[in-house]
Every structure is written in C-alpha cells, then in structure tokens.
Amino acid sequence: LYRHNEQAFWQAIPRNAPGVIHLMGELYGLDEIKPRKILDVTPYGVAQAETFKKEAGNPFREDGRKYKLNGGIDAKIGITNNMTMDLTINPDFGQVEADPSVVNLTAYETYFSEKRPFFIEGKNITSFNIGLGDGDSGNDNLFYSRRIGRNPHGHADLEDGWYADRPNFTTILGAAKLTGKTKNGLSLGFIEAITAEEKAEIDTGGGRIYQTVEPLTSYLIGRVQKDFKEGNTLLGGMFTSTNRDLDQNLGSFMHKSAYTGGLDFTQYFNKKNWMFNINLAFSQVAGTKEAIAETQRSSARYFQRPDNDHTEFDPERTSLMGNAGRIQLQKQNGHFNLMLCSIWKTPGFEANDLGYMQESDEVLSVIWAGYHVWDPKGIYRSYNFGGDVYVVNNFGGDITGKGFEWNGNMSFKNYWSAWTGGNISTSHPSTGLLRGGPMMEIPGNISLRAGFQTDYRK
C-alpha cells in the first residue's frame, strides 16, 4: 500500500532479518509440470551509419560519415533445468547504454558498471570480491567483465602528416558461458572468450600501413561454490587466466600472461545472526622486462619511490607475484550490528588484466557498529545510526590513512526524513600523491553532511 508505505507478504520477513532467501515460503503440491528445455538461437545483422565533424586533410574523417555492416549469432541452451549455456559469435553491443562522460584527474582507472546482457546474467557466481563496502576498494574483484571487449591498449605511432583510424573497442570473436546451480547446492560459472587482434589503419600520405593496438587474447574464468548444512557453510574457489599473442611493440608494456585464483569460506552461526568470511587470492603476471617494469612503476604500487624501503624496483624482472585477502566477522541481525574486517593486498599483487583494483601494498582494518530501530514511537517511524574506525597502512609499516566515519538517518511519521554523516581524518603520509615521488604529508580534515527529504508520496 504505497500511501502508507506498507507491504503484504505471504511469508512475513522481519525487518531485522539477516537475509531474505532462507526465510521465504515453500510451495508444495505442483506436480506433472515438465519444464521446457531452452534452445534459443538468434542471428543478427546490423547496418551502422556514423556522422561526425569533417576534418580537412584527414582521409578518415574528411567525409563526415562512416558506414559499417556487421553480423553474428547469439544462442542460449538449457543443459539442465538449473544449468544454462550462453554462446555468442561476434556479439552486438550497439544497443547497450553508453557509459557516462567522466573527467578523471586521478592516477586510477575509472570503474564502469557492466551493461552487456551476456555478462550480466549469472554475474553473481563469477564474482570474487576482495574489497569492502562502496568506497574505493569496494569494486576490487578478480573478474571485471569490462576487460573483455575493452578499448584497445595501444595507440598508433604517428609521424608528422600521418593520420590514423583506430578502433574504439576490441571485437569479441566468440564467447561461451556456463552458469547455474545444481540441486545439491553446487554453483558453477565458467566463461571463455576470444578477442580479436585489432589494428590501427594509418595513412602516411603515400600509402596505408597497419599497426597492432590490441593482440589476439584468450580469457578464461572459472568459479565454483558449494553450499553445506542448509546454506550455513559455503566453500568456493576461482581461477582466471589471460593469455596474449604479443608483438614486440605491445610486449613492451603488456603482460604476456596473467593468472589469478582464490579460495573463499563463509560460515553462518546462530540462525545466520553471525557470519564469518575469509577470502584468499593470489596473482602472477609475466612478460618482458619492459612490461614488468611498467607494472612496478604503475599507480598501484610505485616501487620506484625514493623513500620506499620495503620493496625494490628490479628492471630485470620478468614476472611478479602477490596475494590478497579479506577476513570478516559480522553480526547482522537485531537492533545492534557489528563488523570487524581486515583486507590486505601485498605489493606484488596485480589483478588488472582480467580483474579490477586500484592499489596494492596496503592493509585496511575496520571496526564498524550500528544501531537500528524499526518500531514507531513519538515523532519517528524508524531511525538508524552507525560509525566505523579505520586504519590503513602499507607493508613497510607507514600509516597511510586513519580516521572515523559516521552516518545516521531518521524517518518521521509524516513521511519526511533527515540524515547526517561525516568523516574525521587525521594527518597522514600519502605514497601516491606525487605519483612515484617521495611520500608527502596530507593534513587532517573534517567533513560534514546533512539533508532532509519531504514526503516522497507527493
């Protein structure tokens, strides 16, 4: 009932419940229903016309328009009632919503959410998160599907008077995905994708030449997870691999191969009121000395910092290894909630070939507590408040972040609401502010926020 903000459920689920699925009702007595085996094959063809501003002298843009024909096949096959295979050849993502424009002045890559249906379906089983919350580390994951079909890594090497036509994305030659969950609680997720070698076409004024800007690449993702004891125990693992067919130019800054893997364990206690979770991950990248030197100098680790005394920049390396993990204990039911968490990534951990991360060489420790009241009383309908204390340090013992965060929200009986929050950060050294230079002290700061909302029903 929208005007009263009320909902009716067949099986009532308490507001303070530690979950939803395990509290849902069960329906019995439906017999003689035979599910249809799925077999959908969808060929497609696309005629594309692109217009842009004319550019005099540029043979690729002097007409102000470009035409393209494309085609491919998508297929969905029901292996069993609970297991589905998706296949695609030269998929068409032309109708997918475009990413928003972003001005990024940081040293870190912008994270974009996935919008392509092929990768969205079954996304939960192919995920292996090694971050926490919705902050900078919240997106850290061993699999970031936007890597497949991404904008090419390389750029055309042009001389004066030369013009280039460079592709904006990498063609996915073919991909296969198997996802599902068996009756005995085994979840499976496998993806194999092959992306094409992409070349930039260059007009030299006297002819046309081609330069490779993205190599032929094979991506593999494998994820399994098993439920035990009516879903109170979960044990899983993940493995990813990236293998590239590199030429000499691309081999100077791209990894020849990259592998990551992990194990995860989750245990619920006391009717799911308490949860313990541990995720462990490893990474190994290999390539030329120049490529691994680029990795050591990247914004994720800055091994070349002059005051870096716990890691060493080695220009002779041809591989880099590291590990990461998260240990978490959480109370997630009742009025009072609590979380203790520690996350780490060693200096050599690197997941950006097929995953996503911003920084390695860090340890984040957090203690969070919150209180929630749902029973109306006086002028309010409900309220909640919470706060956390956090400390960030690197593996050299430098405290690179420390502070306290809080937030609160109150909903009133007239359906207005108000909220407040803030952050107190102490002064601390930054290892990345000078982007490879020495550490620099950042002064402490206090930030506050507050707001209110009128009756949302009007």
Describe these PLM feature segments.
Residues 33-54, 116, 120, 138-149, ...:
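Transmembrane beta-strand segments of Gram-negative outer membrane beta-barrel proteins
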Residues 139, 144-181, 318, 329:
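Outer-membrane beta-barrel transmembrane strands
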Residues 53-59, 99-102, 156-159, 200-207, ...:
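Outer-membrane beta-barrel translocator domains and adjoining extracellular loop/strand segments
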Residues 19-34, 79-83, 122-132, 177, ...:
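Outer-membrane beta-barrel proteins
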